[in-house]
């Protein structure tokens, strides 16, 4: 089983690349955003718990997010592996994932970060915001706040996975095909 954690700042191309990687490697794509939307829309018990925090403008606790992710993993017992997109975002979540995966006889194979200069990513998101309808892609100040949050909470994961020799940085600038080629080169050599 191959399990890839794909991360990078908003606009780095994670969603676009995840589509290619899940097909090429027959992975189950687990997007935290999609999982949250499913649980909220279907008013699941975990969705109800998350909504209480969200309605108060608070971050959903690690335990709730992790429980949603575990539920989703358990729905795919025959998967060839997972592509985690948007999870883990914090050290607590990374540790929770490392505790859970061995219970299904697995572990994180690699963590791949799509890296790109903030100014290029801001331009990408503002451009995407013209057609995506996402309010958080249309406001440069909000985009920069998201980057600050990434730097504070998610960037420390680099050291965590480097210590396990599971971290790979990939240049996220170029055509979609060029970036896909860089990613597959890393995965093919694991």
UniProtKB/Swiss-Prot annotation:
Broad EC category: transferase
Record's function text: Catalyzes the reversible transfer of the terminal phosphate group between ATP and AMP. Plays an important role in cellular energy homeostasis and in adenine nucleotide metabolism.
Recorded metabolic or biological pathway in which this protein acts: Purine metabolism; AMP biosynthesis via salvage pathway; AMP from ADP: step 1/1
Entries under Pfam families matching the protein: ADK (PF00406)
Listed GO MF terms: adenylate kinase activity; ATP binding
Record comment regarding domains: Consists of three domains, a large central CORE domain and two small peripheral domains, NMPbind and LID, which undergo movements during catalysis. The LID domain closes over the site of phosphoryl transfer upon ATP binding. Assembling and dissambling the active center during each catalytic cycle provides an effective means to prevent ATP hydrolysis.
Subunit structure: Monomer.
Keyword tags: ATP-binding, Cytoplasm, Kinase, Nucleotide biosynthesis, Nucleotide-binding, Transferase
The encoding gene: adk
One BP annotation, GO: AMP salvage
Location of this chain's protein in the cell: Cytoplasm
Disulphide connectivity of cysteines: none
Full protein name: Adenylate kinase
Catalytic activity, EC: 2.7.4.3
